[in-house]
Amino acid sequence: MIFSNSFIYWYIKRKFRKLNVRPGMYSQYGQDKLVFELLGNKQCGNFVDIGANDGVTFSNSLFFEEKGWSGICVEPHSTIFKNLEKRRKCKVLNACISDTNKDVTFYEVEGASHMLSGIKEFMDERHFTRIHREISENGGAVTEVKIQAITPQSLLLNHNISKVDFLSVDTEGCELSILKFFNFNEIPVACISVENGSRSPAIFKHLTSNGFHLYCCIGCDEVYLRDY
């Protein structure tokens, strides 16, 4: 089924909900609480957290780790990754998710705006403008570095993951590109929380055409469930 952009904007707006973050949960808008409930308070599940930051601040996966889930956190920013390594017990990887297992050019932001870092190839002009505006206002610097890239298939194969209960994607503008690298027919994923601050209809179109439906919008994230 083909949806117009105007319909998608209307539909996404209807799906917006607000949750209070409860003690013991770490997500910025309560995504972890919501996903845990949607998956039936599942025990011994697994997660893949792409753009995991320092592993604690606004983490969508730390709650699940503390519940005994297994998983992997992926964070490309070299400085932030050092904090991730110290703070998390799960598997961690300093890399970018891409369509290649070769090195890619990474736009690494230092300072208060470090969470805006990302793969240069996938950033649009609005994101570049935001980075330089925030550096101008808050200080910091940005450098281009080469960093290891890995495909989702290689990532999961290397860590013996055959299916994913919860996929979190928060990569500051690269979310759609990363989702397109996943072959959801080969890699079953039950639930996805993906940042979409601009409410671009492209993510909705891609995921609904790959067997998911939008459950709700919460903060800047959209939460999708697999159709079974």
Regions found by a protein language model. Give the residues of each.
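Phosphate/nucleotide-binding beta-alpha loop and adjacent structural elements of enzyme active sites
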Residues: M1-Y228
